[in-house]
């Protein structure tokens, strides 16, 4: 959803897991892509005393578009679990580590990519703002769920389709001819929503929004 959990929310989550003796697997893959004015808090900073029951997953793939390098990090403090994980990776998965090229790309991204990343954040913020203004101007019953992190925008179109996901899916794919993530695939609460990747050139975002608007107008929804 693009929500960045606050320190208090993380603390409450850790307390619940402590109470019921549960592990925490925390996917922080989008942690570098945070909106201006929003603070990301690593879960390890909140509960270092619970580190033996926490697994943190990160990767440069989302932020730096390096998914093809197949390089990621899994931080496991618990020595027993660490050994089990290594045995599983080396045995069952037949993987013995990242490739030399992947490691080099990851190091370069994290050590030399700050200026590029700051420019990317500005560009993403601009794309979010463009979609927000477009909806207000042309599709006023829809609204953008403002993401605190990630490059994924949620469009709430229930003002036009009233949670009818099949109608919305047909509008998007057959009328507008755009392939977004249908909200309902993420659960019942996602009905009537579409998820759009805004890490795209502005021209692509403009074309997408224009197609959606045209489809809604042709169906006499606007």
Where are these regions (language model features)?
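PLP-dependent class I/II
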Residues: 1-222
């Amino acid at each position: 959803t693009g929500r960045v959990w606050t320190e208090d929310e993380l603390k409450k989550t850790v307390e619940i897991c402590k109470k019921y003796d549960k592990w925490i697997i925390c996917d922080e893959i989008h942690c570098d892509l945070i909106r201006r004015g929003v603070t990301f808090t690593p879960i390890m900073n909140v509960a270092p005393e619970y580190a033996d029951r926490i697994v943190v997953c990160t990767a440069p793939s989302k932020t730096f578009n390096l998914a093809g390098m197949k390089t990621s990090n899994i931080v496991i403090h618990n020595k027993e679990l660490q050994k089990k994980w290594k045995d599983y990776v080396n045995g069952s998965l037949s993987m013995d580590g990242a490739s030399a090229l992947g490691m080099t790309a990851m190091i370069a991204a994290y050590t030399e990519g700050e200026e590029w990343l700051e420019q990317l954040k500005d560009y993403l913020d601009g794309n979010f703002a463009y979609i927000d203004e477009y909806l207000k101007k042309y599709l006023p019953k829809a609204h953008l769920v403002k993401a605190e992190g990630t490059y994924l925008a949620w469009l709430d179109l229930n003002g036009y389709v009233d949670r009818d996901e099949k109608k919305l899916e047909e509008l998007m794919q057959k009328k507008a001819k755009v392939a977004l993530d249908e909200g309902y695939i993420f659960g019942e609460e996602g009905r009537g929503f579409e998820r759009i990747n805004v890490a795209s050139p502005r021209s692509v975002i403009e074309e997408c929004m224009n197609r959606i608007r045209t489809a809604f107008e042709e169906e006499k929804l606007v």
